[in-house]
């Protein structure tokens, strides 16, 4: 483990017009309670924004990525972090040991040699290794933050364009970043502890409260992680869905349980529900598992589209006037097990703009109807879908929970 870090209003509601006015300047944007938010819609834009965030840092950089690859993009970002250290910026980088398993630890030696701090989540080889930290964020000077579903790897930055991941990022500037700085500090202390005790991690997730949070404010950070019930971020989505009039969702991995499926169907009966899901992925079982669920949803009026342009890695939920952007998928792992970060923004103008964004993704997708779904559902296809759902939606989830929750005091 590398060295530990040193210890050390007026509401401006966005309107649809304000959000659209930022489209030509690199994405949808708004100002809210002294915070500026900007949506980054393209892979090259994500990489450019991350580089600019690092190069613009004056005092500190704090990064966590599930995957940090040793490819061209990984070397570029690592080089920028080393350059930041050379100009006196304190740099801390954490990665997930499972997600970044293909990247040798010595790849990060230049950062440690430059005086940066480096740690791996889940480095201890035990059943705890099955618990993954799926969060992705970069914080500069505790005032600017870039988050979303993307990792540090060529595929997420549009390289190559014909087979990349289509993802989303959100740049946040303002006082709301302090909450994630606080969470990052807790996470670094846990990663820096030799034992990386599971009980401590569960307590962190269960007890985390956003510092200085205004319960009536429009912005709220929600954390996900391994608890005995639905993950905290998913509990909030559940609460919104139970009262939802309209639901629009873009999900890279979709295999929720029956309760969530019923809530989606209920929204469809009210004002409508639309899902944009992948037509292809790095793991074909995840696509097949999602397709097993299409029939019951289509029968209940849910609109389903499969994205065609490239692989889909986006995590975006719009429930009435609330928008969720972050790292969490809508599968059993993200709903119950993985550490996740989502930002919930409640603003009618922002929600409308993000629905417009989803409209554009729908135009790049193929709509699945009940007729086309039934026409493609042969017996071999159905067997494949059931096996895939068993593996993705049941076995992985069940085994991980039983190994790690068999004794809440065990480590």
What are these regions (language model features)?
Residues 2, 6-411:
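Charged, low-complexity intrinsically disordered terminal segments
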């Amino acid at each position: 483990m590398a060295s530990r870090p040193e210890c050390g209003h007026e509401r401006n509601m966005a309107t649809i017009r304000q959000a659209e006015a930022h489209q030509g300047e690199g994405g949808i944007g708004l100002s809210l309670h002294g915070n500026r938010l900007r949506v980054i819609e393209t892979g090259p834009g994500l990489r450019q924004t991350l580089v600019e965030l690092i190069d613009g840092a004056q005092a500190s950089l704090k990064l966590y990525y599930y995957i940090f690859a040793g490819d061209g993009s990984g070397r570029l970002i690592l080089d920028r972090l080393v350059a930041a250290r050379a100009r006196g910026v304190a740099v801390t980088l954490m990665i997930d040991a499972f997600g970044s398993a293909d990247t040798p630890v010595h790849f990060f030696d230049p950062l440690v040699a430059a005086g940066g701090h480096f740690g791996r989540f889940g480095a201890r080889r035990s059943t705890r290794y099955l618990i993954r930290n799926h969060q992705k964020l970069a914080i500069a000077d505790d005032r600017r933050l870039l988050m979303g579903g993307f990792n540090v790897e060529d595929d997420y930055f549009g390289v190559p364009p014909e087979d990349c991941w289509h993802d989303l990022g959100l740049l946040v500037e303002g006082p709301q970043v302090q909450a994630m700085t606080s969470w990052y500090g807790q996470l670094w202390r846990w990663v820096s502890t030799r034992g990386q005790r599971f009980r401590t991690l569960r307590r962190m997730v269960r007890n985390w409260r956003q510092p200085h949070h205004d319960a009536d404010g429009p912005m709220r950070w929600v954390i996900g992680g391994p608890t005995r019930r639905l993950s905290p971020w998913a509990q909030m989505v559940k609460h919104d869905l139970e009262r939802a009039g309209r639901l629009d969702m873009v999900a890279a991995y979709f295999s929720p349980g029956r309760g969530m499926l019923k809530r989606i169907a209920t929204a469809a009966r009210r004002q409508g529900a639309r899902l944009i899901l992948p037509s292809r992925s790095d793991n074909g079982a995840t696509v097949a598992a999602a397709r097993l669920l299409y029939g019951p949803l289509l029968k209940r009026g849910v609109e389903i589209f499969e994205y065609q342009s490239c692989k889909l890695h986006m995590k975006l939920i719009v429930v009435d006037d609330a928008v969720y952007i972050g790292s969490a998928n809508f599968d059993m792992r993200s709903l119950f097990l993985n550490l996740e970060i989502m930002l919930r923004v409640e603003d009618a103008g922002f929600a409308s703009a993000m629905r417009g964004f989803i409209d554009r993704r729908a135009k790049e997708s193929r709509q699945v109807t009940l007729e086309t779904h039934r026409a493609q559902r042969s017996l071999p296809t159905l067997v494949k879908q059931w096996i895939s759902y068993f593996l993705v939606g049941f076995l992985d989830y069940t085994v991980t929970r039983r190994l790690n929750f068999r004794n809440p005091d065990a480590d």
